[in-house]
Design a protein with these regions (language model features):
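Structural signature of hydrophobic alpha-helical transmembrane segments
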Residues: 40-56, 76, 100-111
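Intrinsically disordered, low-complexity non-transmembrane regions of multi-pass membrane transporters
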Residues: 1-14, 185-205
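N-terminal membrane topogenic signal
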Residues: 13-24
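Membrane interface segments of multi-pass transport proteins and intramembrane proteases
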Residues: 62-76, 96-101, 160-165
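C-terminal ends of transmembrane helices
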Residues: 57-70, 117-127
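Cytoplasmic-side transmembrane-helix entry/capping segments in multi-pass membrane proteins
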Residues: 68-81, 102-108, 132-136, 194-195
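Hydrophobic core segments of alpha-helical transmembrane domains in multi-pass membrane transport
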Residues: 30-34, 50-51, 82-89, 111-115, ...
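Transmembrane alpha-helix boundary signature
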Residues: 87-103
Length: 205
C-alpha cells in the first residue's frame, strides 16, 4: 500500500485555491454560484458568508468528531452548519440590510450547500483544528474568487451582452472559465510529456 504523507498547511491552501477549487474543479455549490453572481456586490457578500460558515463548521467538526457516534455525526454537522448560517444571516441583516435583501433566499440556503457539509465530513472531522481552519479559509476563498470573477464579468458585460445577467449567460461564462483552466493545465503538462524519453519496443528473444 503506498505511503501518503500528511498534508501540510501549504497543501491545504493549494487544494482550496487551485488544485481542488470547489467552483472550478469539484463543481460544488453551482446553484448559488450561478444565481447570485450577477454583480460584484452580491458575489462578494455570498462569498464572505460562505467563508465564515466554512471556517465555523470545519472548526466544530474537527473538535467534536471524535466524540460522535457514526450514526449521528452527519446530523450534528448539519445542525452546526445551520447554527453558523443563522448567525451569519442575522449579522448581515443587522449590519448590511441591503446586502441581506440582495442575497435573498440564497443566504439561508448555504445550509444545503454540499461544499460545506462535504468539507466538514470528508476533511475537517479527520484533521486537527489548525488544518481544518486553513481548509475552511482556502475553500471559502477559492469559492469566493470564482464568485467574484463571474460577478465582475457579468456586471461589466451584462448590459451589453446578450443573456449575461441571465442563468444561461452564467453557464456560458462558467464553461469558458473551466475551458481556460483546462487549457492552462494542458499547456503546463505538455512540456513534461514531450521531455519524457520514448522507450522502443524490443522483441522478446
Amino acid at each position: 500500500m503506498p505511503y501518503n504523507p500528511p498534508m501540510t498547511p501549504a497543501d491545504v491552501l493549494r487544494n482550496g485555491l487551485s488544485a481542488s477549487n470547489p467552483g472550478l474543479v469539484q463543481l460544488l455549490g453551482l446553484c448559488p454560484l450561478l444565481a447570485v453572481s450577477t454583480s460584484i456586490h452580491s458575489a462578494l457578500g455570498l462569498g464572505l458568508a460562505t467563508l465564515a460558515v466554512l471556517v465555523t463548521s470545519n472548526a466544530i467538526a474537527s473538535v467534536v468528531a471524535r466524540w460522535l457516534l457514526p450514526e449521528v455525526r452527519i446530523a450534528v454537522f448539519v445542525l452546526a452548519i445551520a447554527g453558523a448560517v443563522t448567525s451569519v444571516q442575522l449579522a448581515i441583516a443587522a449590519w448590511w440590510p441591503d446586502l441581506h435583501d440582495a442575497l435573498g433566499i440564497f443566504l439561508p440556503l448555504i445550509v444545503t450547500n454540499c461544499l460545506v457539509l462535504a468539507r466538514a465530513e470528508s476533511f475537517a472531522s479527520r484533521q486537527p483544528l489548525g488544518l481544518a481552519l486553513i481548509d475552511g479559509v482556502a475553500m471559502g476563498l477559492g469559492f469566493g474568487l470564482v464568485l467574484l470573477a463571474l460577478g465582475a464579468v457579468r456586471e461589466l458585460l451584462g448590459h451589453g451582452l446578450l443573456l449575461a445577467l441571465l442563468p444561461p449567460g452564467a453557464f456560458i461564462l462558467l464553461g469558458l472559465m473551466l475551458a481556460l483552466r483546462n487549457w492552462r493545465l494542458q499547456a503546463r503538462t505538455a512540456p513534461s510529456e514531450a521531455a519524457r524519453p520514448e522507450i522502443a519496443d524490443r522483441p522478446v528473444a
